[in-house]
Amino acid sequence: YKRQIVCYKQLIADYPQSAIARKGGLQLGMVYFNNGQTDESVAAYQQVIERYPTSEEARIAVADLKSVYVEKDAVDAYANYLNSVGRSEQAPVSELDSLSYMAAERTYMTGKGIASLEKYVRNYPSGAFLIPANYYIGKASFAAKDYDKALPAFDYVVTNSPDGEFAEEALARKCEILYLKARYDEAFAGFKELEKKATVGENKQAARLGMLRIARNKRQYGEVVTVADKLLSESKLSPDLRQEILFARADAYFHTGKGENAADDWRELSKDTRSIYGAQSAYLLAQYQFDNKAIDTAEKTLNTFIDKGTPHNYWLARAFLLMADIYEKRGETFQARQYLQSLRNNYPASDDDIISRIDKKLSELGQTE
């Protein structure tokens, strides 16, 4: 291509006023551009425009120059140049809007950040491409955990294009940010809207899961049960999520006077005591049975739990404490003390309340340390 450049330059120098020189100038700009020499390409096209302003080649050069400036992400410079040579009519505001966005999007898509998109949003407050520009700003900022920047960008998309192609993902991310910021009322309303609008299964599930967690946090137990039932009917539910949802529903049942429903969920969860939900459920099931005077059943539940074992020492210790209550209830205080003393001697050092619970119980049984 270097030989081509030499030839075109020579042609322009030897026949500066000919049609061949004008066409050579266009070819020179194209060769430079195709070989990544954008500054040289700009200079070549500008030379054609300035030397032969009324020619057809000058009009073509303006159009080709546009592509070079878009590639350089320098549409402002393109507009300024056209103004300087009296050709601003060839780049109306609507076209500059489009070109500026194209250049900014290209920069973003090639991994060079969102600065150009942010500049576009500032320069064109009524621009035709504010929706995608804000979406990409939000997406990149969310990935970088810059939630303060991502939230208004996603909010703009959701507010100004509620049914557009970017709306669902923008709403999903907006809700996630609101949840992370503990703005639960706004997040719940957003998740509820997302549940209705979502066409992507993952987004619908995320919406329901968000609603479940917020409802549980706010002790809205009826809502917890309703949303949990919807989630549990889904086919694509990971084992971990299924356990979390079952546990939340059991807790809601228990707090609304539906103990047997809660016990059913705890019983299901207690089959896997490797998980925190399973271990806690095994204990809660036994405690529920004990409180309802099903002492033998509670003992059986505890023995099953103890035999299975669990990595969650706290709930295993609570099971031993409850076992001591069972022995005490039967009048077997010596056995109860043995359980408690053994637990005290073997429970790993911890900042939880197990040791204080043991000491309190031993004191009640008439033995102090």
Where are these regions (language model features)?
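Acidic, polar-rich low-complexity tracts and alpha-helical solenoid repeat scaffolds
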Residues: Y1-E369
